[in-house]
A protein has these predicted regions:
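Conserved N-terminal subdomain of the carbohydrate kinase-like
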Residues: 1-58, 83
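Short low-complexity, flexible loop/linker segments enriched in glycine and/or proline
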Residues: 16-19, 100, 161
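Short gly/ser/thr-rich secondary-structure transition/capping motifs
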Residues: 32-41, 93-99, 127, 196
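Acidic, amphipathic alpha-helical patches
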Residues: 43-44, 104, 172
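Structured loop/turn residues at beta-strand edges in well-structured enzyme cores
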Residues: 49, 109, 140
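Conserved beta-alpha-beta core of the PfkB/ribokinase-like small-molecule kinase fold
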Residues: 53-136, 152-153
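Conserved phosphate-binding/catalytic region of the ribokinase-like
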Residues: 76, 126-212
């Protein structure tokens, strides 16, 4: 926590509403908050701290000025560590699909791993299959694409092929944080096993743990 900083501005608020099946919808209060208005001087020097992995995503990668500040910093981080990117699309905040896609593609090009939901892919790339999008990203340099599909489970796609694990039947209370948990487990596996090991049976084991 020694890297934590204090701002006079309030924190962004995310107001969550749940439907009868536990699905979440969001309303965001972002104007005038510290979350999207900060200085590059706040960010740690990657050459000093030598990070193992950078996990980044959601609105801070698409809302200015934060997105540009973070992208410049992430380019420095990429010299030392792989980047895991989760678009976590929030079209209620930015409903301009072309701008959103441009922002996502910029981060994908910098990332080793992309974790994305089938809903996000459907909104970003209507008419394209998730496999087509994933293969295009991999051709561009991404090592692993993990696609979350809710109750249908997870798919991991690498240059070697696709690995699929089914969902686990549970009584859903709410879905908030489910995708974040998947991302955390993937990051843990990258640190423990190395990104190049996440293929075949090893990837299947990781995805199964994430699905549970």
């Amino acid at each position: 926590l020694d890297l934590a900083l204090v701002s006079d501005k309030p924190t962004c608020l995310a107001i969550v509403s749940l439907d009868e099946k536990g699905g979440a919808s969001y309303e965001f209060k972002i104007e005038g908050t510290a979350t999207f208005d900060f200085s590059s001087s706040w960010l740690p020097d990657p050459s000093r701290y030598k990070p193992q992995v950078l996990h980044i995503g959601t609105l801070v990668t698409v809302i200015e000025p934060a997105c540009d500040v973070l992208y410049d910093w992430a380019m420095q981080v990429a010299e030392f560590a792989p980047i895991v990117f989760d678009p976590n699309v929030r079209s209620v905040v930015l409903n301009d699909r072309d701008r959103y896609v441009a922002a996502v593609e910029r981060w994908v090009a910098l990332s080793s791993v992309v974790k994305v939901s089938d809903d996000d892919l459907a909104w970003l790339y209507p008419g394209e299959s998730y496999s087509e999008v994933a293969q295009r990203w991999i051709a561009g340099g991404v090592t692993l694409v993990v696609i979350t599909r809710g109750a249908a489970g997870l798919i991991g796609i690498t240059a070697e092929g696709a690995v699929e694990v089914p969902g686990v039947k549970v009584d859903v209370v709410d879905t908030v944080g489910a995708g974040d948990t998947v991302g955390a487990i993937v990051v843990e596996a990258m640190v423990e096993k190395g990104i190049l090991a996440l293929t075949g049976d090893t990837l299947k084991e990781v995805l199964h743990r994430a699905a549970v």
